[in-house]
C-alpha cells in the first residue's frame, strides 16, 4: 500500500543518511564470540538458499488472477501459501477474520454543464498482456470506504486537496462549500483529500492521476513504457486511517465472528462525502470545462489545458453505491518454536492481497518472504534451532485498511505486549538501494545486517552503496562530510501505509520496514497493469533484488532470533529523540514569530495594498499569539534517556568483552525481559488526542498526512494545528513515556552490570 510509484520509493521510505555510534564489539552485537561464529555460519547457509527462479515462479502463480479481499483467488492464494509453509517444514495455519469491505455496485462521474461528458471509469486491456483482460474478476475502479451518495454540484479544482491548498483557496476568495472538488493524487495519502474537502463543506470528491506525477511527463506509458496510460486509474482506500486502521466496525478488538460491531453509520473512519478516482483521460474534460481564476503555477499538471480553479461553470454528477457486506480475511501464520526462549517472538510479515493482480504490490515483497521461509526449512533439517520463536505471516486485507495485520494484532495484543521482540515488514520491492524505516533502537542492528549483504548490481555491500548515494545526494560540504564520517545509516521514522502500523503504533513493538527501490520508475500502482507482464518487463526483471531482500530480512530475523542479548542500541534512539525535541521547540518559536509578523502585516495593511485589484486576495485571519510552552519535561526526559543509553552501552561492552562469557550468566535473561519492554514504554495508555488507538509517543502518521510520519506527534500536531491548550499536556505525556523508557533501559543496564561487574 505504501508505495505510490517506484520513482518515489526512496522518498517514501526516506533518504538514507548516516548517524549513530558503532557496536560495542567488532563482532555481532548481543553475541558471545563462539555464538557469533556459529551464527555467521548459519546466516551464510541461509543467504545461499533464495533463488531468482523460485521468486519468478512464485510471482507467476500468485499474480495469475485478481486476488482482492473476498475474491476466490484471494482464498486460493492463502491456501497455496499455507501449503508452501507446511511443505517447507513449518507449522502453519490460517486465521480468519470477518471485516467490512465495501465493493461498488454503481459508479457515475459525468459532466452535465456546460457540455456533456460521461467518464469511462474503466481500464482497457492491453494487447500482449494476458491478465489485463480478466475484467470479470477485476475490482472496478473505486475508492474503498467512500460513503454512498448521489450529488450534482459545481466543480472546483483543489490541487492536491491538502489543508495548505484550502488555505490558499480561501485567500483567493474561492469556497468549496456545496461543491464537488477534483484533486490530483500525490501530495498526501488519498484518504486525506475527501476528509479535508468535507471539513470545508464540499459534497463530493474526485481524485485523478495527473501525468505530471506518474504518466507521460516521465516517459513512455504502458505498454511501450512503465508509466501510467491515459485510462489507468489508481484504486485505493479512503478510510480515515489516521483515526484508526483495520475493520471500521471493530476498533481496538479483533474482528472475529462473534465480535461486537458498530453499525456502518456509526463508523467514524468511513468518509463523510462520496469519492471516486478517475484516469487523466476522464479528468481532462472535467478540468477543461472549468473557468475562473488560473491555477497557481505549482498547481498545474501536465495535461494540455489551462488549469483553472472554478467554481463552475462545470457542473458534475457523482454517484457511488456499494455493497456493504462483511468479507472473510485469511491470514496465513507459520511458526518455528524457540528452543531457549519460546515466549519471545520475532514476527515477520508481508501482505498477500492486492487491488487487482498486484505483481509489484504486494507480490514483489511477498515472494522473498516465501524464500526466507524455505531457507529456514532447510536450516531446520541441518539441525538449527532458533533461540526465540519465529512467526511468519502473509497478511490479508492490507490494501483496504491494513485489515489482516490490524485484526491479528488486536486479537493477540496481550500476547504481543508480553512476548514480541520485533516486527519486520516488507511490502513492494524494486530495483535499487536498501531503504530502511523503523524503531531507532534497531538502527545500529540493521546497519550491521546491511554490511553483510551484497548488492546484485554493483557487488558492493548494500550498506556501502547506500552510503555512497548519500554522499552523491548531499547538497552541502557539511552533509558530504557527515555522510563519509558517521558510522551508521540513519533510518527513517515510520508513519503508516503498511502492516507495521499496528505493531509499532498500537502495541509498541520495535519495528523495521525494509525494501529495495529508487531505480527506474512506473505508474501502474493499484491498476490492472500491475501484473506479471509489467513487472518482468520493466522492474526487477531478473529477480535479483527479490533475492537481496530475502537475504536481508532473512538474516535480520535469524540474528534477532538467535542473539543471547537482544541487539537493541539506545544511543541512536536518544540522539534521534533529542533531534526531534529540538525540532518541536523550534517549531513553536517559528509559529509564534510567524503569527506575530502576520498580525503586524495586517496592522500595516500590507495584504490589501499589495493585492492585484483585478484578482484580489483575501487577507489572512488574525491569530492570537500562542502561549508559552514549557518544554522542560521533554528536555529532562531526553537528557535522562541519553545518560542511561550510554550507561547501557558501557555495560554491554563489558559483558561482551573477553569472549562474552558473561552473556551465559542467568542475569542475562532478566536483561532481555527488561529490553523487551523498552519500545512498549514509549506508548501511552491514553493515546493521541482524538485518536487513542495510536499510542506511540514518538512516531505516528500525521492527522493530515496519512502515511507521512509525525515525530513526537502529540506535541508537534498541537503546535501545527494551533491547539495550544493541548501543548503542555502533550509535552508532559511524551516526557513521561521517554522517562519510562529510560527507567527500563536503566534496569537492563543494572542487570548487565551484575553479569559483568
Annotate the PLM regions:
Residues 24-41, 60-175, 211, 226-245:
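Noncatalytic luminal/extracellular "stalk/propeptide" segments of secretory-pathway proteins
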Residues 41-49, 63-72, 141-146, 157, ...:
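Second-shell loop/turn segments in exported
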Residues 154-227, 339, 343-345, 355, ...:
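A conserved hydrophobic secondary-structure block that centers on an alpha-helix together
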Residues 211, 332, 348-402, 407, ...:
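Alpha-helical metal-binding/catalytic segments enriched in His/Glu/Asp
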Amino acid at each position: 500500500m505504501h508505495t505510490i510509484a517506484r520513482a518515489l520509493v526512496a522518498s517514501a521510505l526516506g533518504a538514507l543518511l548516516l548517524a549513530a555510534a558503532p557496536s560495542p564489539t567488532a563482532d555481532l552485537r548481543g553475541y558471545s564470540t563462539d555464538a557469533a561464529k556459529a551464527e555467521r555460519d548459519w546466516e551464510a547457509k541461509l543467504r545461499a538458499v533464495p533463488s531468482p527462479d523460485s521468486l519468478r515462479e512464485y510471482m507467476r502463480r500468485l499474480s495469475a488472477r485478481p486476488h482482492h479481499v473476498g475474491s476466490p483467488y484471494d482464498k486460493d492464494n492463502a491456501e497455496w501459501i499455507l501449503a508452501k509453509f507446511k511443505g517447507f517444514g513449518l507449522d502453519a495455519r490460517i486465521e480468519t477474520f470477518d471485516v467490512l469491505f465495501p465493493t461498488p455496485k454503481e459508479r457515475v462521474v459525468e459532466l452535465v454543464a456546460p457540455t456533456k461528458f460521461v467518464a469511462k471509469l474503466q481500464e482497457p486491456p492491453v494487447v500482449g498482456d494476458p491478465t489485463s483482460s480478466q475484467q470479470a474478476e477485476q475490482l472496478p475502479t473505486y475508492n474503498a470506504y467512500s460513503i454512498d451518495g448521489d450529488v450534482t454540484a459545481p466543480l472546483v479544482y483543489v490541487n492536491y486537496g491538502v489543508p495548505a491548498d484550502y488555505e490558499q483557496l480561501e485567500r483567493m476568495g474561492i469556497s468549496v462549500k456545496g461543491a464537488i472538488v477534483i484533486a490530483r493524487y500525490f501530495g498526501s495519502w488519498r484518504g486525506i483529500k475527501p476528509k479535508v474537502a468535507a471539513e470545508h463543506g464540499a459534497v463530493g470528491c474526485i481524485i485523478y492521476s495527473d501525468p505530471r506525477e506518474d504518466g507521460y511527463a516521465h516517459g513512455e506509458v504502458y505498454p511501450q513504457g512503465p508509466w501510467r496510460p491515459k485510462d489507468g486509474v489508481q484504486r485505493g482506500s479512503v478510510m480515515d486511517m489516521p483515526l484508526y486502521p483495520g475493520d471500521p466496525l471493530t476498533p481496538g478488538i479483533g474482528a472475529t465472528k462473534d465480535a461486537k460491531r458498530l453499525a456502518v453509520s456509526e463508523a467514524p473512519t468511513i468518509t463523510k462525502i462520496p469519492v471516486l478516482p478517475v484516469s487523466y483521460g476522464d479528468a481532462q474534460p472535467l478540468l477543461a470545462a472549468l473557468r475562473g481564476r488560473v491555477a497557481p503555477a505549482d498547481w498545474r499538471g501536465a495535461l494540455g489545458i489551462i488549469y483553472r480553479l472554478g467554481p463552475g461553470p462545470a457542473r458534475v454528477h457523482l454517484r457511488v453505491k456499494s455493497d456493504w457486506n462483511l468479507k472473510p480475511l485469511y491470514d496465513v501464520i507459520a511458526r518455528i518454536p524457540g528452543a531457549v526462549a519460546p515466549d519471545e517472538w520475532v514476527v515477520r510479515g508481508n501482505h498477500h492481497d492486492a487491488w487487482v493482480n498486484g505483481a509489484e504490490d504486494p507480490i514483489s515483497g511477498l515472494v522473498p518472504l516465501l524464500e526466507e521461509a524455505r531457507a529456514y526449512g532447510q536450516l531446520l533439517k541441518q539441525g538449527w534451532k532458533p533461540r526465540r520463536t519465529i512467526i511468519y505471516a502473509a497478511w490479508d486485507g492490507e490494501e483496504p485498511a491494513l485489515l489482516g495485520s490490524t485484526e491479528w494484532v488486536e486479537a493477540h495484543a496481550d500476547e504481543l505486549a508480553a512476548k514480541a521482540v520485533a516486527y519486520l515488514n516488507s511490502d513492494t520491492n524494486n530495483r535499487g538501494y536498501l531503504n530502511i524505516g523503523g524503531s531507532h533502537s534497531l538502527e545500529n542492528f540493521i546497519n550491521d545486517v546491511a554490511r553483510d549483504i551484497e548488492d546484485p548490481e554493483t557487488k558492493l555491500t548494500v550498506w556501502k552503496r547506500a552510503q555512497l548515494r548519500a554522499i552523491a545526494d548531499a547538497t552541502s560540504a557539511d552533509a558530504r562530510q557527515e555522510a563519509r564520517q558517521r558510522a551508521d545509516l540513519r533510518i527513517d521514522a515510520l508513519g503508516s501505509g503498511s502492516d507495521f502500523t499496528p505493531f509499532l503504533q498500537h502495541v509498541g513493538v520495535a519495528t523495521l520496514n525494509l525494501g529495495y527501490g529508487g531505480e527506474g520508475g512506473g505508474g501502474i500502482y493499484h491498476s490492472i497493469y500491475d501484473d506479471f507482464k509489467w513487472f518482468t518487463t520493466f522492474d526487477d526483471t531478473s529477480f535479483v533484488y527479490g533475492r537481496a531482500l530475502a537475504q536481508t530480512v532473512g538474516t535480520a530475523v535469524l540474528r534477532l532470533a538467535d542473539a543471547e542479548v537482544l541487539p537493541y542500541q539506545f544511543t541512536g534512539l536518544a540522539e534521534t529523540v533529542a533531534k526531534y525535541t529540538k525540532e518541536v521547540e523550534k517549531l513553536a518559536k517559528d509559529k509564534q514569530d510567524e503569527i506575530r509578523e502576520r498580525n503586524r502585516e495586517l496592522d500595516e495593511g500590507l495584504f490589501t495594498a499589495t493585492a492585484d485589484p483585478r484578482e484580489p486576495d483575501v487577507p489572512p485571519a488574525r491569530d492570537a499569539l500562542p502561549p508559552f510552552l514549557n518544554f522542560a519535561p521533554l528536555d529532562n526526559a531526553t537528557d535522562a534517556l541519553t545518560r542511561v543509553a550510554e550507561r547501557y552501552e558501557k555495560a554491554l561492552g563489558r559483558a561482551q568483552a573477553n569472549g562474552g562469557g558473561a552473556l551465559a550468566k542467568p542475569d542475562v535473561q532478566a536483561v532481555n525481559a527488561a529490553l523487551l519492554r523498552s519500545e512498549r514504554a514509549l506508548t501511552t495508555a491514553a493515546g493521541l488526542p482524538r485518536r487513542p488507538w495510536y499510542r506511540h509517543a514518538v512516531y505516528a502518521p500525521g492527522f493530515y498526512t496519512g502515511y507521512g510520519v509525525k515525530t513526537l506527534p502529540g506535541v508537534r500536531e498541537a503546535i501545527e494545528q494551533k491547539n495550544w491548550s493541548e501543548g503542555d499536556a502533550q509535552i508532559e505525556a511524551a516526557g513521561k513515556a521517554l522517562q519510562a523508557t529510560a527507567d527500563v533501559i536503566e534496569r537492563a543496564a543494572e542487570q548487565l552490570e551484575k553479569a559483568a561487574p
